[in-house]
Structures are given as C-alpha cells and as structure tokens.
Amino acid sequence: MDITVILCTYNRCQSLAKALESLAAQTLPSAVEWEVLVVDNNSKDQTRTVAEDYSRRHPGRFRYLFEPQPGKSHALNAGIRDSHGDIIAFIDDDATAEPTWLQNLTSGLHGNEWAGAGGRIVPAKNISFPRWFPPDEPRLFRTLALFSCGLEPGPLTEPPLGTNMAFRKEMFDRYGGFRTDLGPCPGSEIRGEDTEFGGRILAAGARMRYEPAAIVLHPVSPDRLRKQYFLTWWFDKGRSEFRQFGIPRDATWFVAGVPLSLFRRLARWTLLWILSISPARRFSCRLKVWTLAGQIVESYRHGHSRETVTAS
C-alpha cells in the first residue's frame, strides 16, 4: 500500500466525524492505494461507533485500532506499527482537510529525495487577534496549532506540526518513533512529540519539503485566544524543551540543581517584560518568562529525581 493516514483520537467523537468526512472526500489518482487508520486512545465516548461506521461505509478505506495505554505518543506509535503504507501522513481529530490535501502532501515522497513533508495549517474561520498578540512572531501561531511558511514550496528548515505532516515509513525504522515522555496524556499537556521527531530527522541530515497547497483547517476556539491559554502552553513548552535538550551547554553553576544561567535569563526577560510599553511586546516577553519558568521547574524535577536515585 502507498499511504496510511494516521488519526489519533481521544473523546472527540463529534469533531472526529467531521475529520473523517473530509478524509473520505480526498481525491487521489486511482493507482494510489491508501487507507485511514483511526487510533482510539482509550476514549469513553462514541468514538468507536463513529470510526466503525466509516469502516462499514467505506470498506477497505478506514480501519479502527484501539490503543489502551494513555498518551498521544503511545497512540501514534501503535498506529505506525499497524500501518500498511510506505508513506505515513498525520492529521488531528479536530481538523479537516481540503480534498487535495493528501495528494499534495505526499506526492513528493514516493521517491528518495524527501524524507517527509509538511503543509499549511490555517484557521477554520476568520479570527480577530487581541491587541496583546504579537502578529510579527510566527512562532506564536504554533500555540494555536497553525503553521505556514508562505505560499512557495521548498525545503523545510523547521519541523512541521503533527496536524499536517507526512514521512516515508522507513524514517521511523531508521530514527525511531515518537518520544513517549512528550505528547499530551492524562494529567499532562506537555507537547512537542511531533516537532521533536521532525527536528530529529532534520538534525540527522534528512530533507523535508514544505507543501503550501496541502491545506488543513484547524479550529481556533475563543478560549485559545486568552492570555492564560498562551501562558500555560508556553510554560509546558519550556518543560518540553528541557526534556528534549537537557541542561544548557553553558551551564556551569547550579542552584538547587538548576543551572544558574536559566535564572539569569529569567531575570533579564522579566525586566524586559516590566519595561516594555507595547502590549504585544510586553506579552511576548512575558511568554519568554513563562517558558523559562517551565524549563526551571523541569530542571529542578530532573535534578531532584537524579539525586533521589543516587541516594537510594
């Protein structure tokens, strides 16, 4: 088989139905064999009923897989193991794909030039950003699961988001699966499992392609346009970054197991936050403070855990 689309889901049966409907409407050449694998990560709602309904209505196109171990990365890795395609594409259960999405995203992956590809993720509806949102900082759009590198195709220099990405399956054989200490799970919203994998293969020298014509629509609910959502997201991102990259290379001195350099950066960005006049600039600095706070918390936990193991 040429392509497997993996869609992991947890307790979102209503948005899942919309996502599957958009996948059923995909237009690909008749010579391309493809499937959609719905990985149910221990949902308690009507997820299985919805998925199996699509399997009956579209025999051979949709499959259902139950993964009982909580955590999105566990579900992703289970889907990869069970996939039949030589190319694996990913989309989220609250997103919808334009009819040409899968064809545009994967068309360049049938050869050996590209290891993977990423497409654009755009808001499902027009949204108005608040005054405090810094519109000239593309990194902040990732908070809303939005992604764009412009309208021209070409090589990717940054990892795409899991809502709209694809890889040749051999990349997982070569570089491993998604890290299970990253990715949302019960009791934790630490993310980054998708960008960590993309960054891992880019760091290894593999090439990824940006396909702006591969478009996924993602909802942006009003609660995601609140300051608290951004602050929580970037705090968790700081924790994720420490798990990915560990102690900073410039760390020489430590306080309670935390690199002193992190406290210096925290003080610097706190001062910039206090002194900034522009609402957007102030909030941008504040997000940096929250990110560093997340790194410090995770660094402290890591150091405390290491001391406990050593003492025992």
Where are these regions (language model features)?
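Acidic donor-binding loop at a coil-to-helix junction in glycosyltransferase catalytic cores
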Residues: 160, 184-197
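Non-catalytic, C-terminal membrane-associated alpha-helical segments of glycosyltransferases
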Residues: 232-239, 246-312
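Short aromatic/hydrophobic "clamp" motif used to bind/position activated sugar donors
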Residues: 88
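Short, flexible, basic/aromatic active-site loop/helix in glycosyltransferases
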Residues: 136-158
